[in-house]
Amino acid sequence: MLGYEKDTVAVAFLFLTRTRTRRLKALKIFEQTFASFGLDVLEYRDVPVNPENLGSSALESVPVMVQAFIKRPERAKSMLSFDKRLYTAKQLTKNKLFESELEDSLFFTSLSAKTIVYKALTQSRALDDFYLDLQNPAYETRFCLFHRRFSTNTTTSWDKAQPFRLIGHNGEINTIAGNRSWAKSREKMIGAERNEILTRDGISDSGSLNEMVEALRYRSSIPNVEDILAICMPPANHENNFYKFWSRAMEPWDGPALITYANGYTIGARLDRNGFRPCRWARTEDHFYLSSEAGTFDIAPETIDAKGTLFAGRGVTVDLSNGNVLFRDPSHSRDNYDAPFDPRVEKIPAKIEAIEERFDDKKGVFSFTDDDLSKVIYPMAESGKEPIGSMGDTARLAVLSTEVRSFFDFFYQHFSQVTNPPLDYIREQVVTDLKVYLGKKPNIFEPKELIPPAPAYEVDSPFLSLAQMDFIYSCIDNATDMDRVIPYVIDTTFDINHGTVGFKSKLRKIGEEAVQAVLNKHTILILSDRKASKER
């Protein structure tokens, strides 16, 4: 349809600002940056659209839509090298747009030699009315990833519409704040320039996941998108070394979430370990269908060879080169089955020794109330029961309280409570995982074959027993350079007579001490309040 031979060009689908001067400046940066990588823009094509079906807000913000055809350079011998070159050029372009204060003037809807993303701020049934390309009978494809869903957590816009360049997402990422913080730290690991970021501000949780999947696809040694999604969304209570190895380097992106993807080589989906988003599939002799709901496609029942449900922590991949449908776990794939994955972890003994020492005199120091003890702590410690005191808190915010409050009362978790189904304590054991690894976090962008991870300790819960804490403290004196698991204790208390000035000074010193400890090769930091008393 477009007049180019297969695999000779890539198509960049661009959303551009309607302000002409800013649009021309952004396109100039785009062309020059891509040309510096040997990626010459052959021509631009105005995407034919029919805006009559758009709503008022969508019509007010509709961007200029252009497709740029980019020639594959001769030095890009493989499609993977071509894809990596395109990704690197895109990242540098975004960096330069940021420096020129033009970051909102150009958005890469898609950039690939295999896929083109058509998305709009419109109802799904009106997509082919808006994009006239989708009405053209010459426009054929072997596969399609179609997304229809409104945004629940962010104000929607044209760039936030789905799918993104690699993935489509149904659900939420409730760990997104931590995921974004780790992404920021990884920018230092990969030696990114000051303004080159793995995931930028002002985008949705789905957009952040897409950018991380892209980064891992084109910067790391992880071979396939299905592997990347399995690493980002591992099954609960996994015991095989593949997941242990990668879980040390990548924190989970927890949903509830159903993630679909398409890169032109494979198309597939993965359900996160909570399993709270429906996913139904059906296979006929000629087609494979997957959707959030059964009945989305009008399939004659007699033509269905097999059908089923995608379960929590599982995925499916369709190989577009041969049509094979694979439900196997990526840890058992041909690339990974015989590969050595040594997580280099050792379990800390969880046995709790008899403790004679009492800490009743500390209750007042830490502002524990009788309700905290009788309704929360004692029932949980003695019988493992749910804390009945957690059902609502009508007390005023700690920062506004005239009473002395616990330090922990000043912090709250932010998550999408309204949209999440309930999780009972029985099912919780099956679909959640509390494992924590203590030690140096490996760089997921380093080739795993060349640089084995430093040793670490594995614990089954983020709550450590006193015996486990004593074990970690014992490593301070016994650790050697060969162990590479070297704890460091930072005292977090300060003289109460120094008041607010002392508090601020201590916070600054804690940060400085933590940085210096890491520079001195310590791999576990213990923030200790054991010296807390009436004076500190």
Where are these regions (language model features)?
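Conserved short alpha-helical segments that host acidic/polar catalytic motifs at enzyme active sites
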Residues: 1-450, 465, 477-483
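Short acidic loop-to-helix transition motifs that present clustered carboxylates
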Residues: 150-152, 495-496, 532
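Phosphate/ATP-binding catalytic cores across multiple sugar-kinase/actin-like superfamilies
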Residues: 252, 505-521
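C-terminal accessory domains/tails appended to large, multi-domain proteins
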Residues: 468-471
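Structural preference for beta-strand elements that scaffold enzyme active sites
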Residues: 487-489, 524
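Active-site mouth loops of central-metabolism enzymes
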Residues: 490-511
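Conserved structured catalytic cores and adjacent interaction surfaces
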Residues: 499-502, 517-536
